[in-house]
């Protein structure tokens, strides 16, 4: 399974580092993987990395448990074992919003499997799927100035040596499909930066059916499902700056600059221990144009029906020691478009950002509104807590207001903290061992084409048929296409003669339309799209 110069790894949560795993998977102190459907190690899909040449020999010869710093890693991969699946239909017993699990069975190399595990005339035991969207050490993406800057037209493209697949870097875009394809194929060229040996591996751009296989496994008891009827949606990467591995605070979160959580960042829910801490009285600054109304301590925003406006309510306070700020907030508004959010800044630096809440699910009358409590533990310093109710350019819903009450600031308060997944919610397993950026981030080109139509992909002729899936109809059952259309409300538009190339996953700002089951079409031209790479061996 491991090719030459690939290193098995696991994540040490205590120290927030990746370490070399025991390749035999017998050492429980340095475990590598588990594809069990339950138990302590559920969701621990096998991860492996390549490293730069500087310390490659050291890490290859190192003992299990050796730290492998992210600075030395240039690519990260996740193993997708060979499996067969019952083709899903009718939301698999669930609903559009909550489809059921896909029935997946792991099989041996000589047993029947879905077609993603057939590569040319070879039956695969599995394949390595890139853990994150494709990035680059030096190339950036700026529309109009860096289009097709990979410059890859053959399998010996020098720019491919700068490919990186890791978290917290900006995805590479603005390249057409052929550029991404030849960059992926060039990762195994002689003298490559990753240590790949071309006689052992085939590096290529993800085909549509390979994406589909990952989507199937995600929507199974080995991925995001805890039973045949209970599954959770992969959270969106909502970073509008295209940072890899980021996550929103809900599956369909609206975009923020860098996302809410990094890939390994936990969410901490705190509860104040009653009777601890001393009260700090914050200074309240109301909006001068659309002031909030104070009704017995309940503040409501003042820009109802005022389109393209924002009404703010600001609390300023100073903590002389570690402390907390807590509050209750709610909203009754047009779903997705009119939202209440909050932001906490320390000395003008944002330390807590949110995507906001919207809709009418919390209530349609003020007396019956359901509120959500938030508690944030803060270090010593001066802070501003700003609530913002923002209106889009048209349409109202519910009461068309945001609500805030019970704002409390305490110096020296004690809290009971509960650690929950944060960034991990954006992976295919809900753990750090899954695959990221498959919902949001950037749309991703895959090698799936309608009727072998080259269009604006950049190919002079298509590569060997083992590198792409060809479709000749307006629908297809399999590959997570027609059979999973609109699951979780993910967008779905099939390829055609005008836009013959598939892309998957969705953008940072697609909200509910983004997801592992999203499909859409394009001419294959350079655009704000990235790609995903695969290793078979």
Which residues does each PLM region occupy?
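Short beta-strands within extracellular/lumenal beta-sheet-rich domains
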Residues: 297-319, 337-340, 368-375, 404
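Extended extracellular/luminal ectodomain segments enriched in beta-structured repeat modules
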Residues: 318-328, 381-384
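Short beta-strand-plus-loop segments that form exposed binding edges in beta-rich domains
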Residues: 387-398
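C-terminal, surface-exposed recognition/capping segments
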Residues: 209-212, 236-265, 330, 386, ...
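Extracellular carbohydrate recognition and processing domains
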Residues: 349-381
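Short aromatic-cysteine micro-motif
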Residues: 67-75, 105-264, 412-438, 537
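Extracellular glycan-recognition surfaces and repeat-rich motifs
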Residues: 264-300
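Short, surface-exposed beta-strand/strand-loop-strand elements in extracellular ectodomains
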Residues: 336-348
């Amino acid at each position: 399974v491991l090719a030459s110069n690939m290193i098995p790894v696991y994540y040490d949560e205590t120290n927030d580092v990746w370490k070399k795993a025991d390749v035999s998977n017998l050492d429980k102190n340095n475990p590598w993987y588990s594809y069990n459907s339950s138990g302590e190690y559920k969701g621990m899909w096998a991860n492996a990395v390549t490293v730069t040449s500087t310390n490659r020999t050291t890490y290859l010869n190192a003992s299990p448990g050796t730290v492998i710093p992210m600075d030395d890693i240039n690519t990260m991969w996740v193993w997708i074992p060979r499996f067969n699946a019952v083709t899903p239909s009718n939301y698999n017993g669930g609903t559009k919003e909550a489809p059921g699990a896909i029935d997946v069975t792991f099989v041996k190399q000589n047993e029947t499997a879905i077609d993603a595990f057939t590569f040319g005339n070879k039956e695969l035991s599995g394949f390595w799927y890139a853990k994150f969207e494709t990035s680059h050490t030096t190339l950036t993406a700026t529309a109009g100035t860096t289009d097709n800057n990979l410059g890859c037209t053959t399998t010996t493209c020098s720019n491919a040596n700068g490919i990186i697949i890791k978290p917290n870097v900006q995805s590479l875009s603005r390249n057409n499909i052929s550029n991404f394809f030849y960059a992926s194929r060039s990762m195994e060229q002689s003298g490559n930066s990753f240590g790949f040996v071309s006689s052992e591996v085939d590096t290529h751009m993800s085909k549509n059916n390979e994406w589909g296989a990952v989507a199937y496994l995600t929507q199974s008891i080995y991925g995001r499902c805890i039973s045949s009827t209970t599954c959770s949606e992969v959270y969106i990467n909502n970073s509008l700056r295209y940072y890899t591995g980021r996550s929103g605070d809900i599956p369909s979160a609206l975009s923020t600059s860098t996302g809410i959580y990094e890939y390994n960042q936990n969410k901490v829910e705190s509860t104040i221990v009653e009777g601890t801490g001393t009260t700090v009285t914050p200074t309240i600054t109301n909006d001068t144009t659309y002031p909030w109304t104070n009704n017995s301590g309940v503040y409501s925003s003042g820009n109802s029906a005022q389109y393209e406006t924002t009404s703010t309510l600001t609390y300023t306070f100073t903590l002389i020691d570690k402390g907390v700020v807590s509050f209750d907030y709610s909203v009754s508004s047009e779903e997705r478009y009119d939202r209440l959010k909050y932001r906490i800044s320390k000395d003008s630096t944002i330390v807590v950002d949110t995507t906001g809440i919207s809709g009418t699910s919390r209530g349609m009358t003020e007396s019956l509104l359901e509120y959500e409590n938030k508690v944030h533990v803060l270090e010593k310093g001066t802070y501003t807590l700003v609530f913002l109710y923002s209106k889009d350019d048209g349409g109202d819903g519910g009461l068309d207001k945001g609500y805030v009450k019970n704002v409390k600031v305490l110096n020296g308060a004690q809290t009971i903290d509960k650690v929950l997944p944060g960034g991990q919610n954006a992976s295919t397993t809900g753990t750090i061992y899954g695959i990221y950026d498959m919902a949001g981030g950037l749309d991703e080109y895959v090698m799936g084409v309608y009727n072998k139509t080259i269009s604006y992909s950049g190919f002079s002729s298509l590569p060997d048929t083992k590198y792409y899936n060809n479709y000749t109809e307006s629908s297809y059952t399999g590959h997570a296409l027609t059979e999973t259309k609109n699951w979780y409300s993910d967008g779905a538009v099939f390829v055609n003669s005008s836009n013959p190339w598939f892309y998957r996953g969705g953008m940072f700002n697609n909200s509910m339309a983004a997801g592992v089951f999203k499909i859409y079409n394009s001419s294959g031209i350079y655009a704000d799209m990235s790609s995903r790479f695969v290793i078979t061996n």
